[in-house]
Curated annotation (Swiss-Prot):
Keyword Transport assigned: yes
Cellular component GO terms, alphabetical: mitochondrial membrane; proton-transporting ATP synthase complex
InterPro entries in the cross-refs: ATP8_mammal (IPR039017), ATP8_metazoa (IPR001421)
Protein name per Swiss-Prot or TrEMBL: ATP synthase F(0) complex subunit 8
Assigned keywords, A-Z: Acetylation, ATP synthesis, CF(0), Hydrogen ion transport, Ion transport, Membrane, Mitochondrion, Transmembrane, Transmembrane helix, Transport
UniProt membrane topology term: Single-pass membrane protein
Function: Subunit 8, of the mitochondrial membrane ATP synthase complex (F(1)F(0) ATP synthase or Complex V) that produces ATP from ADP in the presence of a proton gradient across the membrane which is generated by electron transport complexes of the respiratory chain. ATP synthase complex consist of a soluble F(1) head domain - the catalytic core - and a membrane F(1) domain - the membrane proton channel. These two domains are linked by a central stalk rotating inside the F(1) region and a stationary peripheral stalk.
Residues bearing PTM N6-acetyllysine: 54, 57
Keyword Membrane on entry: yes
Amino acid sequence: MPQLDTTTWFITILSMLITLFILFQTKLLNYTYPLNALPISPNVTNHLTPWKMKWTKTYLPLSLPLQ
């Protein structure tokens, strides 16, 4: 079984790390960052129908009447 032969592990792991390091560097160097990030004001919408109480009522175990 070749997995149990640990003589090639160091070379395999080292080559993998070097390859990933080079790939990540090229990916990060090719990324173009935006020049100016200006804040955009969000559009606020007013809803005409408010929440109805039957949908916002919470039932906590301690607030229920005792039986």
